């Protein structure tokens, strides 16, 4: 069936008076029950007609509209599903939930797992940052929006419903809300994404697209017989109803306000205006008319940058009868107000659902939104904190979040301080860049933000002030977000076997304490020995592999490594190998197995303790379980205090002392998600319909590792080290069981050794060390004082030996000193008005310092020295320092200095 046939096959439309027409403006087909309609009604073909003229029979608030929609589909046999987090924990390819169908990808849509209900309805908060730069400007764009949806998952021989029923539901819903059939347009717009495609109808009312009805029945294939957007597709066995109804757009259409922002969070908009430098009343009739006209024209003009934006503003100004300057005095501040209102709602969902701001991954997107909001607040001279607006959104929405508002507030306060530090440092950084480059390109601005966190507007402003050629690139924030919106694929090393083998029966799943077993050799390839069944654990999930022996025919074969490839366990055997068909006895090193088990179970206990002490935003970011220690990386916005670390360790050991049972079972994926939530996926997302769920005390995770039978078998847990390994990620290094005892014994040995060296009892070590430290600081101060005295004396001696150039003292010397002494001496000489260079031999290199107490730039002189002596450096105008390969003597230095002074004279 061709795409045209797919649309013509929707008999509901023809049976209910809808006629298929082609729009003369865009050339696309649409369906209408209005015999007079010739244009599709979709901007830019036609402007909004609902602004000032609501299309529903009554105005709705967000919660009212959401409930109305969900109830509508519940009454028609759909199971109501609770919203998923905006942080897509169940996905390995994307960070944020971008559509309601994303909740059910990849396992439900591929048919691997059943849907939580079929059919189902949901109102899913989604975050899309593709149009970040358009938010506030067009009147319709949002970073966070709720996609109300109903889905039906159809399988061969089991159809729930398809195109006719879907269009009928949409028409009935709109009719109930007060929209006449003649006012509904269904525009044909084939959909494609993520390797799938299908026919799609966009529901348009009053010029506003309120719903998208996708009929996903195609999969990408090079020999497919249907082409959509340049790719070829073929029919797939499963076919899915994938709809999206914009909650905010429904509310906007019901109110007919100038912008969507005025409809969905007017209280936040008013609060920002009342506490900012905005000097006009949003409810003023002239202001409302200007904003309404801007929204209408923005709808038909598309991208609003540069000349198109100027055209929009001139058109609106002419229509309303004001100057462009007067119009911009209203529109530009309002765009910032609307953007800030939108962004703070998005931040609430990001942080509330557990994102921790950082410089990488999903945390990058949270920080991007926060810093953009802080910049907007500065420009508006906002007399409130971002948290005040976030809290307002929470009250309006009434949603419950995993992360309490107190934690959200703490994160925002920390981010504000970090932003201020970045801005203060960034100013000089941009100035230095402008000194080197007279024109800043888009890539320069992206680099300044990505590497240094400097807001684009700030960089553009500073560069322009310094006379550089620069302009604000279009959609730069959207591009920044896009670069970081998808998780990087980790390239795993693929093991290729010559033959095919059945999946190994993995005995360690059922009994991790099993240390001996019987098996048969079914393959030998190189160093790999393949058995039909095995209790040897392969390296996986951050847990090191088992080691041990295979015993056969009186021989002993050492297993030094264990790997897995496509479900087949590969035993790396050192030396000779048992032959295929041999019956073997596997013997696992019990010490290695138990240490790994204790460390793995302890990892779960530690994670639980971290979440209890630090909060629900804590999420596993990596883990490693080895023989002598383990590590756990978690998301957190600052390094925990010593008191918090002590509390975490104490709680973990209480969990261990409580000797709670450790249980594991294979569960249906959807059932496990429903029962335990997405915290299951702390250690990653395992594939398949069924997943192994491990419960360690009060911690529950999808996990394929080996574990103790109870928390008591862990023995004890000792935190060895806590450090921040990157912004927003904290690493806990720890040991459990015997490894913990060994770690404590090593600490005690070091204490005894330190006590012996200082000749005091261990209990007196802190005071003794403190006393020595204070004495050392006093001596250090005295040394620094003496160095200054020496530098002064040395400077006087060198000034007496100085040459003269145009009545200036020129100093050039090779001295015996370290870099710190060189710099101090150079500062003294510069203070005395001298110009020159000092060199000193270092380990494997030569230190060089240039100085100028005159109009000349020491950095430029350093570059000249560097050309001759092969090196480089940097510094201030009065003193610069670096390293070179060649040690110049006094005469050689003077030659360079005199040449430099002559060239720069006047």
UniProtKB/Swiss-Prot annotation:
Its cofactor is Zn(2+). The keyword Nucleus does not apply. Its main location: cytoplasm. It catalyses: tRNA(Ala) + L-alanine + ATP = L-alanyl-tRNA(Ala) + AMP + diphosphate. The keyword ATP-binding applies. Zn(2+) binds at residues 600, 604, 703, 707. Keywords: Aminoacyl-tRNA synthetase, ATP-binding, Cytoplasm, Ligase, Metal-binding, Nucleotide-binding, Protein biosynthesis, RNA-binding, tRNA-binding, Zinc. Pfam families: DHHA1, tRNA-synt_2c, tRNA_SAD. Consists of three domains; the N-terminal catalytic domain, the editing domain and the C-terminal C-Ala domain. The editing domain removes incorrectly charged amino acids, while the C-Ala domain, along with tRNA(Ala), serves as a bridge to cooperatively bring together the editing and aminoacylation centers thus stimulating deacylation of misacylated tRNAs. Homodimer. This is Alanine--tRNA ligase. It comes from Archaeoglobus fulgidus (strain ATCC 49558 / DSM 4304 / JCM 9628 / NBRC 100126 / VC-16).
């Amino acid at each position: 069936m061709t795409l045209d046939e797919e649309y013509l096959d929707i008999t509901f439309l023809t049976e209910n008076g809808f006629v298929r027409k082609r729009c003369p403006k865009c050339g696309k087909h649409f369906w209408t029950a209005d015999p007079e309609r010739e244009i599709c009604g979709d901007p830019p073909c036609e402007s909004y007609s609902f602004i000032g003229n609501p299309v529903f029979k009554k105005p709705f608030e967000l919660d009212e509209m959401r409930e109305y929609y969900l109830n509508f589909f519940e009454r028609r046999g759909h199971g109501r599903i609770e919203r998923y987090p905006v942080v897509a924990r169940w996905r390995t390819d994307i960070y944020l939930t971008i559509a309601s169908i994303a909740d059910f990808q990849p396992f439900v849509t591929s048919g691997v797992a059943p849907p939580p209900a079929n059919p189902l309805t949901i109102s899913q908060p989604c975050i899309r940052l593709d149009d970040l730069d358009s938010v506030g400007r067009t009147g319709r764009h949002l970073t966070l929006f709720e996609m109300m949806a109903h889905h039906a998952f159809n399988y061969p021989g089991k159809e729930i419903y398809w195109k006719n029923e879907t269009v009928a539901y949409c028409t009935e819903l709109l009719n109930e809300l007060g929209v006449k059939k003649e006012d509904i347009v269904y525009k044909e717009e084939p959909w494609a994404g993520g390797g799938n495609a299908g026919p799609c109808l966009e529901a348009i009312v009053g010029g506003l697209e309120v719903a998208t009805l996708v009929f996903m029945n195609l999969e990408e294939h090079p020999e497919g017989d249907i082409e959509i957007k340049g790719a070829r597709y073929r029919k797939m066995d499963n076919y899915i109803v994938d709809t999206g109804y914009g909650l905010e757009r429904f509310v906007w259409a019901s109110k007919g306000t100038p912008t969507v922002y005025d409809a969905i969070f007017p209280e936040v908009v008013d609060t920002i205006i009342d506490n900012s430098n905005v000097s006009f009343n949003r409810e003023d009739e002239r202001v409302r008319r200007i904003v309404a006209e801007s929204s209408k024209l923005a709808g038909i003009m598309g991208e609003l940058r540069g000349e198109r934006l100027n055209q929009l503003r001139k058109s609106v100004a002419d229509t309303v009868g004001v100057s462009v300057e007067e119009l911009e005095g209203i529109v530009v501040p309002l765009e910032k107000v609307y953007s800030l209102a939108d962004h703070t709602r998005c931040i609430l969902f990001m942080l509330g659902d557990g994102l921790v701001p950082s410089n990488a991954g999903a945390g990058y997107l949270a920080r991007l939104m926060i810093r953009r909001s802080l910049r907007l607040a500065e420009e508006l001279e906002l007399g409130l904190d971002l948290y005040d607006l976030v809290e307002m959104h929470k009250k309006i929405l009434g949603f419950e979040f995993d992360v309490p508002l107190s934690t959200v507030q703490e994160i925002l306060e920390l981010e504000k301080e970090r932003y201020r530090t970045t801005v203060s440092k960034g100013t000089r950084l941009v100035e230095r860049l402008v000194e080197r480059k007279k024109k800043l390109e888009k890539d320069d601005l992206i680099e300044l933000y990505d590497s240094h966190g400097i807001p684009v507007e700030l960089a553009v402003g500073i560069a322009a002030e310094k006379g550089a050629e620069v302009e604000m690139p279009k959609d730069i924030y959207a591009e920044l977000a896009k670069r970081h919106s998808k998780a990087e694929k980790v390239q795993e090393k693929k093991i290729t076997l010559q033959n095919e083998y059945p999946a190994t029966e993995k005995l360690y799943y059922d009994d991790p304490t099993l240390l001996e077993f019987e098996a048969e050799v079914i393959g030998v390839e190189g160093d790999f020995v393949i058995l039909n069944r095995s209790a040897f654990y392969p390296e996986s999930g951050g847990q090191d592999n088992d080691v041990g022996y295979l015993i056969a025919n009186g021989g002993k074969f050492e297993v030094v490594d264990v790997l897995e490839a496509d479900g087949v366990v590969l035993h790396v055997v050192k030396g000779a190998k048992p032959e295929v068909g041999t019956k073997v006895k596997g013997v696992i090193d019990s010490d290695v197995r138990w240490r790994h088990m204790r460390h793995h179970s302890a990892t779960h206990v530690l994670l639980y303790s971290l979440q209890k002490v630090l909060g629900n935003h804590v999420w596993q970011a990596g883990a490693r379980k080895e023989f002598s220690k383990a590590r756990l990386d978690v998301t957190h916005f600052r390094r925990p205090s010593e008191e918090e670390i002590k509390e975490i360790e104490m709680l973990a050991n209480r969990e261990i002392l409580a000797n709670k049972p450790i249980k594991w079972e294979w569960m249906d994926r959807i059932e496990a998600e429903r029962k335990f939530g997405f915290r299951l996926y702390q250690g990653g997302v395992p594939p398949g319909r069924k997943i192994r769920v491990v419960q360690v005390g009060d911690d529950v995770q999808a996990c394929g590792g080996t574990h103790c039978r109870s928390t008591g078998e862990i023995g004890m847990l000792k935190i060895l080290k806590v450090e921040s390994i990157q912004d927003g990620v904290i690493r806990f290094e720890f040991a459990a069981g015997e490894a913990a005892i060994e770690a404590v014994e090593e600490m005690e040995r070091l204490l005894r050794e330190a006590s012996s060296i200082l000749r005091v009892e261990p209990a007196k070590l802190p005071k003794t060390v403190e006393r020595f430290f204070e004495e050392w600081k006093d001596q250090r101060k005295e040394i620094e004082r003496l160095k200054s005295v020496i530098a002064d004396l040395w400077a006087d001696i060198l000034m007496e030996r100085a040459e003269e150039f145009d009545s200036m003292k020129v100093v050039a010397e090779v001295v015996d000193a370290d870099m710190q002494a060189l710099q101090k001496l150079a500062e003294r000489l510069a203070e005395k008005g001298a110009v020159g260079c000092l060199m000193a031999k270092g380990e494997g290199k030569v230190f060089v310092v240039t100085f100028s107490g005159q109009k000349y730039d020491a950095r430029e002189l350093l570059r000249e020295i560097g050309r001759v002596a092969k090196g480089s450096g940097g510094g201030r105008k009065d003193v610069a320092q670096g390293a070179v390969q060649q040690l110049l003597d006094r005469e050689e230095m003077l030659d360079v200095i005199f040449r430099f002074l002559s060239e720069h004279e006047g």
